[in-house]
């Protein structure tokens, strides 16, 4: 779903309070700017475009309900990414528990569908990285964020992000046999 349609759909689900209407112009710009990148990050982290869009919608609802405070932040997009990363972490915990339970019940391995075998292998390898390395890789590559932006979102020094990227790339090279 493109950002415009998603925004219109999200707003149509809300009440017509004058308070919300006052907030919409600045929030709408934020939504249109951040939505595509947030979807890319969520999709890369959870491996499902639909689940990623759901998490981004939840993130945007949280952003709108707190918009007066969020819009005053130096980097509202960084705040939204942090909220999204927390949602993705929760999703992984839930999914891992559910997948393990289903695998025991059915005695089959859970599968993840994707666009191509290479993409599945790559993003599967990324998802097996330690959490911080996974988040750094996804924010930097799928989220198209700079080292400084990733550092700000994760509240770590830039040097830590660079180190994590180097370690994550090395781990991926080993996992993918390159």
Language-model-derived ranges and their functions:
Residues 7, 16-40, 50, 64:
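A short, charge-rich alpha-helical start-of-domain segment used by transcription regulators
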Residues 136-140:
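A short pre-motif secondary-structure segment
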Residues 2-10, 17-18, 26, 102, ...:
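C-terminal edge and immediately downstream basic/flexible tail or linker adjoining helix-turn-helix-like DNA-binding
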Residues 85, 89, 154-178:
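DNA-recognition helix of helix-turn-helix
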Residues 5, 90, 98-126, 146:
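Internal acidic/polar
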Residues 65-71, 82-104, 115, 167:
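Arg/Lys-rich amphipathic alpha helix in sigma70-family domain 2
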Residues 35, 39, 60, 130, ...:
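C-terminal flanking helix
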Residues 54-61, 74-86:
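Structural recognition of an alpha-helix C-terminal capping motif at a helix-to-coil junction
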């Amino acid at each position: 779903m493109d950002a415009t349609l998603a925004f219109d759909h999200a707003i149509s689900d809300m009440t017509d309070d004058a308070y919300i209407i006052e907030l919409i112009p600045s929030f709408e710009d934020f939504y249109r700017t951040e939505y595509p990148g947030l979807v890319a990050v969520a999709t890369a982290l959870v491996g499902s475009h639909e689940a990623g869009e759901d998490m981004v919608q939840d993130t945007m609802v949280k952003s709108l309900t707190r918009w007066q405070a969020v819009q005053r932040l130096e980097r509202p997009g960084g705040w939204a990414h942090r909220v999204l990363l927390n949602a993705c972490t929760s999703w992984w915990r839930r999914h891992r528990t559910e997948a393990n339970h289903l695998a025991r019940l059915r005695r089959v391995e859970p599968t993840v569908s994707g666009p191509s075998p290479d993409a599945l292998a790559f993003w599967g390898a990324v998802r097996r990285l330690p959490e911080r390395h996974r988040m750094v890789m996804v924010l930097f590559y799928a989220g198209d964020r700079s080292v400084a932006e990733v550092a700000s979102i994760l509240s770590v020094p830039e040097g830590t992000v660079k180190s994590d990227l180097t370690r994550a790339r090395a781990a991926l090279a080993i996992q993918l046999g390159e």
